[in-house]
């Protein structure tokens, strides 16, 4: 059998491999691959269409054209297999060998490989320590390189031009050797002794930074050559391999023309130039001609390998650049992404989808014709098994005839055989789900309405693809893991994904609303059956308030059985009838309310947590059926009269008009600037629009009705438009506002707001101008959507690439590290409760009761709903939980650190690809994020105008650690901290709210004061930023000179004058002096900061209005100057998608803020032109200083004490700084919070876990600081797991381990720097990745998912993980067995050997080895 397989040269499935290695091929290796040299550029004979001998398609070299038939036709058929025909020299074998047999071309002159020359950094340059420019000049015959200086003063590696060369020849004669072209470079490479070079470089890793960097780079490349055993001269080609002909085919078109692969053209050029050069060399042609031909050959080889990399790309007949070997593998349509990662699959079909309201959740409707085609193989085998057809051909005929028996068989085959439905774009794992097919007439696939949310599908012409899992294993996986009824939660947030929408919601909402004085109000019923009869008889209406006796099932804690319990409930007719579908164990109180979309979602969630998956799926299906039925019965209609325009609208508009007029007046008389006028006008109209919409909603919301006592009362409106918006079925308050309020402000395409609003609404109709303004912004929206989708897809691709190899590989890594979680409170509101943040995580340490100190949860315990309720009751306000970032698993993550699998509700399983899930969860809502946040005039500018802060709850006042304040002469407390916060705690010391207070605010409360809700905590002037003194004294101006550093401004209206600090860029002279104030005491001595010898110096920033006079007495807390807010440039907030990408790419923000490098005291040093020197002196006297541009806003002053990592210069923080100064946990918190802010704005829920997983991947490399006794180089980046393994090994041998520090890489960079070169090459920059990998002789251990997909194995995740682990265990056992046998044999031999030794004593010394 084995020999038979050998004959057919087929791979047996046992050929397992655990790694793939890449390297560089030596000339000998290339020749060993080859089956013969290609000598002629011809391809095929134009008359016979047979390949030319020795040509690019030669049958003698590459194999026969037809299976088992030689070219001349002498030998045909299988019996001559393996014979080589003596006439045409072709081996008789399968034609398939033409896909795998390579040829070669012997180059008449060596040529450099362009990848190693031009791919930056140039590897040739690094090895030779020459510049790329010089090497190019030598290679392309523009200069000579000295290969052997002999006794002359010339330097080896020296470059000389043609003229220099001639001069030196005259001077020194034949003393020295200098060469041109690749030969010269090759000789230099051969002369390099890598060992010696490495020794030299290792000793030379000192000196200037630039030199060290360069040496380290060179050292890395040389070490790579040494380690991989690759000789540097192999970077110069002597032999060129020729690709097998079937991979660069020549295809006849009709009309006698041929379509050919570009590679044939490129090879032809190489062969032509090569043979021409060979002829010239034989003829001993003049040097200059040969040289030119060599250069042409080098260029031809370059184009073949990577066309267009150097110089102009070679073009074909139609002026288009030819596609070279490099182009074949890189880019979206290259080998990696087109064929290895994105394959097309058989047994699939696609069609339009329609709604299938009668289906169960796990079913889909499959058109009969489609099913017949998809399930053909199963039908054929069934027909044969039943004896209806004897051959496949007969079965085919039978199926095509469409006999009744075929349809019966189809019904049989389809039973219990799930199919997979997929809707593009597949943004997360719920984009492919499995269903059981139900055969239907027609040609459209029917889809269950509840899964539309997961697929993001609607029925306006969407198409879906169907795939059939063939093998039993595939069917089993589809059934257990992918069936729609097993995927009811979103993996991103753990919320239910099978939530009804649109008409279902409307129907349920309408049926569960209550009406005052409805027919039948006050009746009491014995059971729901009676209610139904009353409704049918018209005695009670759907919304009437009634009482009814219901049976509730509660679970008995002891037995686990359900126990019935009846009680009388006040409800409405509609709700009572819906109660029949509640699953056992779900109390009626969940349903006894008007069911809006959110409520229904909560209902399904509660059902899933309390009653489990099966009951929930059945319940959801029943809800759906009822919703459709009720919506139909409700008979909704919308009329134009339902859009009620509020009567107060005219008055509000008139008031706004008047205010705008006033602003215009002020502008004309010069009181406000143009910018202020625009902002204020936009503000006024924004507010007017909000007011109109408020009175409109108030009017829509209620309707008058008569109660049973004949009194007129208000009840919630039954207005159709209002009900649609209120229930969450369709539309929103913003849309109703456009229908019945006013359209409001519109945006221009550049995002700025047009200051004249549209005062009309759609009911009144728009005039031409208003309509035109509307179209402006609407078109921008469409253009944006197209861009957004592409950007979002690219973000997802980068995220998937960086996390694709992160899989849960063990149960528990045993760490006790974690991160402290507490509720997120902003501006006094809880944005995210503690419950949301810790649900489904694992406790990292004991959770104690805050008062009794009793243990509420052990470390390692999963925090589920029940436990969290206990914690909330006990008043726990912070919990240390395990996170993905602190997990200590080497490869992958552990289940405990990850916590709950959000998509399934239990602890995560081993083998779950949590990295990909995280990437999809973050990328999938990407399309919903806005590209650019419109600076909505109304909301954005008004939010900034807060001028005080008030308490929202009762409690005790506290301040945060950085809060500092002084008491001024009036006895008020003035805040002088930049990041001060007021914290309000309840009597248990739990934080209730937290408010940021700006610098210069006046506090109206003291620490530990008990306050009531509504108390004003602090006031400040919102339009200016003050500069305040902390100490008392007399003002002494320095450098405050009118006309030089300050200018006098006279207010036109009041006639008062103030001094304004001029921008240094605008000053004529005195650019470097800084206007400032010193304080002097009564004796005229400068006031010093207590405890230091620094004088109190307060600098004025550009644009500051000086409020004091020279010589004026001031007290602490007094304002010296004010900076108008208008003068401050408002930072443009990047929002939406670009912000998320910026965070994950770890880019430094423009105008970034500066953090204190160490804890210490601030002082200002000597200033330079346009910059301020900022110094920090730590307690040990170490000084750190930095130059800060003058226009930056410095937040600290002379003598202030700052902590490491505190913001000292205003601006957005740089993640790199946060990591360096504050550590991993703080960085993770920063990125998680910032990303969540963007998503929260759009109302998207994503669990923090997913973002943490990505941050973990961004931190997976470390930079070596001190290599210790390892082989690393200082400054080298290595995988964290690798350095940990190395250090363990070093410590075991008692050697000095390497020290390292964390480094944060952006996601693109992190993907490219993974250990797997296959994964990196298939992502981006394929050429660079492969070049680097080849030199290093890299081994890809195939740990990630992507590498395994590319080599075509099961991925090591999910069911594949178990398969790979079992396989590796089996290999290890076989290996152990083999070793045991070998050892036994060796022992036998040894024992035999000792017998001989006894006989032959004098020979014993030799045999001892």
UniProtKB/Swiss-Prot annotation:
Catalytic activity: RNA(n) + a ribonucleoside 5'-triphosphate = RNA(n+1) + diphosphate
Single GO term (MF): DNA-directed RNA polymerase activity
Membrane-spanning parts: none
Self-association state and partner proteins as the record states: The RNAP catalytic core consists of 2 alpha, 1 beta, 1 beta' and 1 omega subunit. When a sigma factor is associated with the core the holoenzyme is formed, which can initiate transcription.
Family: Belongs to the RNA polymerase beta' chain family.
Function statement: DNA-dependent RNA polymerase catalyzes the transcription of DNA into RNA using the four ribonucleoside triphosphates as substrates.
Protein name listed in UniProt: DNA-directed RNA polymerase subunit beta'
């Amino acid at each position: 059998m084995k020999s038979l397989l050998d004959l057919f040269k087929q791979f047996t499935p046992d050929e397992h491999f655990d790694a793939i290695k890449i390297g560089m091929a030596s000339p000998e290796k290339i020749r060993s691959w080859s089956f013969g040299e290609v000598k002629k550029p011809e391809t095929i004979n134009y008359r016979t269409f047979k390949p030319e001998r020795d040509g690019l398609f030669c049958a003698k070299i590459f194999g026969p054209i037809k299976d088992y038939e030689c070219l001349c036709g002498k030998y045909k058929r299988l019996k001559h297999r393996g014979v080589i025909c003596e006439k045409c020299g072709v081996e008789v074998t399968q034609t398939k060998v033409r896909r795998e047999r390579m040829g070669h071309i012997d180059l008449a002159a060596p040529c450099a490989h362009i990848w190693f020359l031009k791919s930056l950094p140039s590897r040739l340059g690094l090895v030779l320590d020459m510049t790329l420019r010089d090497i190019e000049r030598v290679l392309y015959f523009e200069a000579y390189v000295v290969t052997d200086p002999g006794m002359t003063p010339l330097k080896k590696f020296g470059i000389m031009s043609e003229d220099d060369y001639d001069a030196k020849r005259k001077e020194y004669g034949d003393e020295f050797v200098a060469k041109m072209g690749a030969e010269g470079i090759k000789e230099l490479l051969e002369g390099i002794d890598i060992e010696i070079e490495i020794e030299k470089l290792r000793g030379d890793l000192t000196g200037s930074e630039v030199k060290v960097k360069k040496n380290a780079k060179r050292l890395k490349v040389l070490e790579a050559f040494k380690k991989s055993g690759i000789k540097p001269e192999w970077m110069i080609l002597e032999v060129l391999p020729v690709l097998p002909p079937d991979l660069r085919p020549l295809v006849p078109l009709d009309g006698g023309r041929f379509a050919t692969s570009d590679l044939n053209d490129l090879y032809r050029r190489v062969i032509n130039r090569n043979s021409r050069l060979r002829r010239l060399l034989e003829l001993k042609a003049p040097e200059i001609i040969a040289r030119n031909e060599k250069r042409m050959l080098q260029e031809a080889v370059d184009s073949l390998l990577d066309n267009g990399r150097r110089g102009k790309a070679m073009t074909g007949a139609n002026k288009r650049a030819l596609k070279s070997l490099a182009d074949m593998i890189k880019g979206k349509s290259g080998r990696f992404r087109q064929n290895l990662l994105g394959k097309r699959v058989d047994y699939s079909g696609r069609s339009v989808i329609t709604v299938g309201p009668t289906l169960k959740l796990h079913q889909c409707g499959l058109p009969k014709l489609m099913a017949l085609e998809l399930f053909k193989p199963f039908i054929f085998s069934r027909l044969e098994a039943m004896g209806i057809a004897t051959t496949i051909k007969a079965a085919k005929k039978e199926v095509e005839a469409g006999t009744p028996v075929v349809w019966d068989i189809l019904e049989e085959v389809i039973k219990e055989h799930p199919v997979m439905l997929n809707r593009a774009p597949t943004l997360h794992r719920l984009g492919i789900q499995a269903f059981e097919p139900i055969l239907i007439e027609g040609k459209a696939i029917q889809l269950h309405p509840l899964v539309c949310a997961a697929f993001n599908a609607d029925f306006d012409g969407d198409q879906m693809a169907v795939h059939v899992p063939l093998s039993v294993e595939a069917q089993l996986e589809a059934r257990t893991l992918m069936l729609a009824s097993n995927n009811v939660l979103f993996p991103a947030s753990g919320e239910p994904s099978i939530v009804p929408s649109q008409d279902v919601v409307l129907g349920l909402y309408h049926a569960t609303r209550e009406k005052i004085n409805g027919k039948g109000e006050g009746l009491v019923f014995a059971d729901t059956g009676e209610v139904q009869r009353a409704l049918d008889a018209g005695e009670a209406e759907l919304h009437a308030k009634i009482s009814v006796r219901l049976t509730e099932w509660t679970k008995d804690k002891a037995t686990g059985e359900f126990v019935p319990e009846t009680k009388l409930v006040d409800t409405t007719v509609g709700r009572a009838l819906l109660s029949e579908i509640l699953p056992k164990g779900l109390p009626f109180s969940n349903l006894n309310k008007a069911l809006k979309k959110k409520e229904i979602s909560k209902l399904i969630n509660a059902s899933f947590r309390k009653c489990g998956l099966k009951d929930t799926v059945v319940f959801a299906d029943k809800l759906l059926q009822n919703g459709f039925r009720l919506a139909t019965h409700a008979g909704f209609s919308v009329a134009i009269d339902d859009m009620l325009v509020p009567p107060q609208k005219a008055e509000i508009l008139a008031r706004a008009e008047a205010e705008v007029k006033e602003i215009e007046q002020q502008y004309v008389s010069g009181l406000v600037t143009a910018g202020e006028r625009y902002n204020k006008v936009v503000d006024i109209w924004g507010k007017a629009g909000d007011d109109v919409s408020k009175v409109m909603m108030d009017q829509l919301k209620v309707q008058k009705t008569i109660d049973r006592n004949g009194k007129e009362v208000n009840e919630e409106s039954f207005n159709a438009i209002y009900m649609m918006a209120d229930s969450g079925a369709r539309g929103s308050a913003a849309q109703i506002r456009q229908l019945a309020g006013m359209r409001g402000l519109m945006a221009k395409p550049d995002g700025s707001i047009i200051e004249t609003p549209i005062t009309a609404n759609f009911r009144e109709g728009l005039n031409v101008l208003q309509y035109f303004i509307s179209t402006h912004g609407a078109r921008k929206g469409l253009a944006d959507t197209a861009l957004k989708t592409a950007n979002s897809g690219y973000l997802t691709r980068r995220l998937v690439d960086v996390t694709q190899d992160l899989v849960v590989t063990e149960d528990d890594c045993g760490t006790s590290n974690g991160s402290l979680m507490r509720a997120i409170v902003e501006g006094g509101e809880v944005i995210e409760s503690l419950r949301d943040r810790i649900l489904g995580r694992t406790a990292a340490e004991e959770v104690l009761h805050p008062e009794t100190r009793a243990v509420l949860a052990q470390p390692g315990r999963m925090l589920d709903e029940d436990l969290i309720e206990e914690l909330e009751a006990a008043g726990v306000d912070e919990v240390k939980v395990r996170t993905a970032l602190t997990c200590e698993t080497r490869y992958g993550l552990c289940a405990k650190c990850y916590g709950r699998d959000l998509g399934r509700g239990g602890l995560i399983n081993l083998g779950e690809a949590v990295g990909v899930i995280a990437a999809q969860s973050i990328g999938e809502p990407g399309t919903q994020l806005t590209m650019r946040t419109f600076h909505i005039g109304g909301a954005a500018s008004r939010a900034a105008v807060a001028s005080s802060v008030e308490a929202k709850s009762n409690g005790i006042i506290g301040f945060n650690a950085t809060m500092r304040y002084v008491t001024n002469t009036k006895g008020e407390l003035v805040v002088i901290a930049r990041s001060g916060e007021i914290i309000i705690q309840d009597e248990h010391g739990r934080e209730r709210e937290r408010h940021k207070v700006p610098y210069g605010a006046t506090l109206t409360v003291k620490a530990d004061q008990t306050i009531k809700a509504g108390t004003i905590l602090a006031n400040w002037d919102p339009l200016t930023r003050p500069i305040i003194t902390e100490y008392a004294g007399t003002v002494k101006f320095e450098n405050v000179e009118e006309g030089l550093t300050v200018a006098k401004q006279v207010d036109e209206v009041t006639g008062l004058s103030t001094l304004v600090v001029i921008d240094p860029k605008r000053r004529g002279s005195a650019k470097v002096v800084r206007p400032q104030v010193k304080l002097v005491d009564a004796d005229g001595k400068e006031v010093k900061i207590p405890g230091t010898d620094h004088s109190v110096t307060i600098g004025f920033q550009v644009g500051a209005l000086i409020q004091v006079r020279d010589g004026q007495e001031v007290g602490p807390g007094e304002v010296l100057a004010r900076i108008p807010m208008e003068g401050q440039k408002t930072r443009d907030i990047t929002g939406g998608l670009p912000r998320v990408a910026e965070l994950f790419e770890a880019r430094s923000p423009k105008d970034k803020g500066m953090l204190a490098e160490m804890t210490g005291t601030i002082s200002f040093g000597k200033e330079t032109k346009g910059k301020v020197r900022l110094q920090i002196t730590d307690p040990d006297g170490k000084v750190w200083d930095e130059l800060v541009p003058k226009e930056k806003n410095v937040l600290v002053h002379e003598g202030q004490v700052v902590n490491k990592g505190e913001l000292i210069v205003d601006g957005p923080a740089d993640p790199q700084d946060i990591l360096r100064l504050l550590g991993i946990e703080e960085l993770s918190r920063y990125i998680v919070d910032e990303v969540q802010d963007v998503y929260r704005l759009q109302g998207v829920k994503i669990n923090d876990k997913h973002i943490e997983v990505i941050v973990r991947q961004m931190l997976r490399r470390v930079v070596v600081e001190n290599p210790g006794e390892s082989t690393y180089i200082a400054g080298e980046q290595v995988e964290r797991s690798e350095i940990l393994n190395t250090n363990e090994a070093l410590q075991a041998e008692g050697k000095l381990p390497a020290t390292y520090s964390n480094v944060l890489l952006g996601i693109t960079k992190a993907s490219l720097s993974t250990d797997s070169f296959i994964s990196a090459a298939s992502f981006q920059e394929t050429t660079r990745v492969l070049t680097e990998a080849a030199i290093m002789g890299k081994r890809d251990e195939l740990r990630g998912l992507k590498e395994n997909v590319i080599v075509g194995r099961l991925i090591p995740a999910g069911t594949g993980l178990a398969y790979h682990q079992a396989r590796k265990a089996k290999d290890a056992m076989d290996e152990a067995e083999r070793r045991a046998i070998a050892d036994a044999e060796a022992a036998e031999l040894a024992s035999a050997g000792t017998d001989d030794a006894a006989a032959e004593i004098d020979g014993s010394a030799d045999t001892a080895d």
